[in-house]
């Protein structure tokens, strides 16, 4: 399987999530879908030019995508317990879910949380796919390591294996 085929497979898998049964979870999944799709397209474009370009996508384009979709009472993003980008901190309400996903790998279903003022939070896990290992794995190329060290001096987002929990997608919205 070529690199591009593996990449496409991994990114398609990346945006697919289990169907949640409750209305709030379905709404959360629907709200997150455009973010995941736009991020996927941006990563595909970056990876087509090499893994080093994907670093720029994650650093520059992903926050812009999240900001552009965070409107009309919707806030969304990505977070992790092992941050690469210090701006991707976990919202306080999502921290217990991230901790649960981290400590209970068998229970990583999407979850919703009732928040104050008729707001709902929704969280989905982000799992490491084979193509992610170029930038998040245990053995990084010298060019990737150099670029990561320059872009993210306090990077903690390496050392993963396929299937590991990378972090979460989260969204907060009005019910």
Label the predicted regions.
Residues 129-139:
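The canonical Cys-X-X-Cys-His
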Residues 1-6:
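Positively charged n-region of N-terminal signal peptides that target proteins for export
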Residues 21-129, 143-175:
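Extracytoplasmic c-type cytochrome modules immediately beyond a signal peptide or single-pass transmembrane anchor
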């Amino acid at each position: 399987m070529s690199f591009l085929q593996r990449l496409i497979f991994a990114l398609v898998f990346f945006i697919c999530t289990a169907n949640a049964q409750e209305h709030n979870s379905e709404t959360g999944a629907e709200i997150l879908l455009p973010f995941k799709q736009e991020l996927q397209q941006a990563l595909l474009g970056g990876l087509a030019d090499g893994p080093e370009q994907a670093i720029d996508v994650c650093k520059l384009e992903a926050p812009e995508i999240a900001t552009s979709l965070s409107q009309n009472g919707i806030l969304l993003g990505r977070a992790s317990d092992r941050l690469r980008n210090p701006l991707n901190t976990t919202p306080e309400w999502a921290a217990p879910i991230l901790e649960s996903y981290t400590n209970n790998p068998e229970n990583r279903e999407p979850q919703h949380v009732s928040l104050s003022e008729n707001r709902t939070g929704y969280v989905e896990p982000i799992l490491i796919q084979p193509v992610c290992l170029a930038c998040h794995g245990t053995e990084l190329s010298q060019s990737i390591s150099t670029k990561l060290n320059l872009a993210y001096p306090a990077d903690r987002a390496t050392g993963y294996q396929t299937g590991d929990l990378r972090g979460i997608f989260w969204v907060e919205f009005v019910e």
